[in-house]
Amino acid sequence: MHKSKEDVAKLFADKLGTDPHLTPEQLTLVARDVLREKYVQAEVGITGANFIIADTGAVAVTENEGNGRLSAAWPKTHIVVTGIEKVIPSMTDLALFWPLLATYGTGQKITSYNTIIAGPRQENEKDGPDEMYVILLDNGRTNILANEKTRESLYCIRCGACLNACPVYKNIGGHTYSTTYSGPIGAVITPHLRQLGEWKHLSHASSLCGNCTEVCAVKINLHELLLENRYEAVTEGYAPFAEKVAWKIWKMAMLRRSWMNAANGNMKGKVVNGMGKAWTEHRSKLIFPQKSFNQQWKEKYGNR
């Protein structure tokens, strides 16, 4: 989405001295050779976890590339960094969650590499790390848990289905969100993981079409949670003064037909295209009809 295969080939040429015209398949082989040596030499490997299994204390990692397995097996020390919401009750629950994650994430029945890691290398074992550490992150997750209305967002299994379905994400990409979690789920949880006043704008980066809710693997009501974030931002006093004034004027106008009819096309154009210059910086100017729908209706049909 952000880089073409030509961009990647040029990057490899600049950093690794390879041919700038390599195909994607050839680039993959180059990356494999370079990275494999890095894994062999590494002292510490850091991975995440798709799930943490409560009854055994094991970590479950699912992937298609095999990088996670290499990070856990080759280095002497393996560090797992994962959120507290990744805990599932038992090993048997993987029979549901692994296929669910694969199907909604990539359309597969199951991903290529599925690994359960229960600790460092034991006596008489030939591979694995000497030490293993699991770091459980809160980082605002208990804030979400304490909020009854947004709590369901912690159900997320990070399949990415909502990102693939979101028209906003498909047009602007993930880097635009400037945060760890992008797309609809990122817009829902980031204001609570960080600071609502600073990140409330993410909840407005949505058409509220509901595609995200429709495709969610665990049935999180995402578009309603985006509205909840907007509501909380306003009730907690994070709405700008100019926005409050604008909505009050809008409300007064909507309750008075004479005001609405008085605002002809020229006036609307001057207000929107003149005062809202940021809107037209990257868009065409909005063109409004000279008469309102109400005026046109009366001219054509009278008062019926």
Give a label for each model feature:
Residues 267-304:
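Short linear elements at protein peripheries
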Residues 159-163, 209:
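Extended amphipathic alpha-helical segments enriched in small hydrophobics
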Residues 124-153, 168-274:
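Ferredoxin-type iron-sulfur electron-transfer modules in oxidoreductases and energy-metabolism complexes
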